[in-house]
């Protein structure tokens, strides 16, 4: 038998893509459109959040800048420079303060600090001096407490977890532990379901909570979805129908799940099949609308496309969370 007559594998269909979609290929799929270029450089953008005046804030993890965007003019400015290492998320308290999560050295020096929008009136909320958390993200509940994710560990060393901080910021209570690189976190509209992404094991956690917000209901901790591919699920947000939007880091897309954890749609970044704009990190709604923004960058493509925010219309309007109450 000659080589010419052997059965041959060829790159066809999905196998031509730098990031093939296999198990979700039949989902309703849309491709996002450009909304705003933040920088010509490849910046690790994260933490999209809006204040009451509908100004957009976001952070750049490795460089430490906190950006502010006027959504009417789309003017981008630097709100302040983080004094802490590797800021990974920004959330806004009902009183208007910005709460910034930072990863520190990715091992033992992360925390959360609060400031005004100019980076002033600094207050340490979770101190790196007396904890070992590597804090990636957080979500407020209606009482003013919050859940945060501990980003530590890796696939065979599950050191991460999710913790609840009381409204007075004095008590930290573990909710789930022993997971690998806890990343995105969101609460359902009724605050009964806590969603958590576990990046390095490619898992989605759905946690049903008791009324105290920290006790897991009987049989309430489940993993409704296992993701595939490199790298894994990142930050998340919910809409008013309780659908969950999960950014897929390293894959240039966002997957959408219904309130029971079933995938119902996906949003693709332009150029992903050619390996462009793959570092999709965070989805967030423009308040009062169903317009979803998604930040990503082109670092894996030698930063050719810079750092972008893309947009689509989602299934429903975004859920108006704690800062708008």
Swiss-Prot record:
Tell me which family the UniProt entry assigns to this protein: Belongs to the SMP-30/CGR1 family.
Q: What does the protein in this record do? A: Exhibits lactonase activity. Acts in cells with perturbed membrane integrity and is possibly related to the membrane homeostasis.
Q: How is its cofactor bound, per UniProt?
A: Binds 2 Ca(2+) ions per subunit.
What domain of life?
Bacteria
Claim: Calcium is one of the keywords in the record: yes
For this entry, the protein name equals: Lactonase drp35
What cofactors are annotated for this protein?
Answer: Ca(2+)
Q: Which SUPFAM superfamilies match?
A: Calcium-dependent phosphotriesterase
Metal-binding as a keyword? Answer: yes
Q: Which organism is it from?
A: Staphylococcus haemolyticus (strain JCSC1435)
């Amino acid at each position: 038998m000659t080589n010419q007559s052997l059965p041959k594998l060829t790159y066809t269909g999905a196998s031509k893509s730098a990031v093939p979609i296999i198990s979700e290929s039949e989902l309703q799929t849309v491709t996002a459109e450009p909304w705003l270029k933040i920088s010509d450089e490849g910046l690790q953008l994260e933490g999209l959040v809006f204040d009451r005046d509908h100004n957009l804030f976001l952070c750049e993890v490795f460089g430490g800048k906190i950006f502010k965007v006027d959504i009417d003019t789309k003017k981008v400015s630097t709100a302040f420079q983080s004094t802490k290492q590797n800021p990974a998320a920004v959330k806004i308290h009902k009183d208007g303060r910005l709460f910034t999560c930072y990863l520190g050295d990715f091992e033992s020096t992360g925390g959360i600090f609060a400031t005004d929008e100019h980076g002033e009136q600094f207050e340490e909320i979770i101190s790196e001096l007396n904890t070992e958390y590597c804090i990636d993200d957080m979500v407020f509940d209606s009482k003013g407490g919050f859940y945060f994710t501990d980003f530590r560990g890796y696939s065979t060393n599950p050191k991460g977890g999710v913790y609840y901080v009381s409204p007075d910021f004095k008590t930290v209570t573990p909710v789930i532990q022993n997971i690998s690189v806890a990343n995105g976190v969101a609460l359902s509209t009724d605050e009964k379901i806590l969603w958590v992404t576990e990046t390095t094991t490619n898992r989605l956690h759905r946690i049903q909570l008791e009324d105290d917000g920290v006790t897991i209901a009987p049989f309430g901790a489940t993993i409704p979805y296992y993701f595939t591919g490199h790298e894994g699920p990142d930050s998340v947000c919910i809409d008013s129908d309780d659908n969950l939007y999960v950014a897929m880091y390293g894959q240039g897309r966002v997957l959408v799940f219904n309130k029971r954890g079933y995938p119902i749609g996906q949003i693709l970044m332009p150029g992903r099949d050619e390996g462009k704009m793959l570092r999709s990190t965070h989805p967030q709604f423009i308040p009062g609308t169903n317009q979803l923004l998604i930040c990503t960058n082109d670092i894996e493509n030698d930063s050719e496309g810079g750092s972008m925010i893309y947009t689509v219309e989602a299934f429903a309007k975004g859920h108006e969370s704690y800062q708008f109450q």
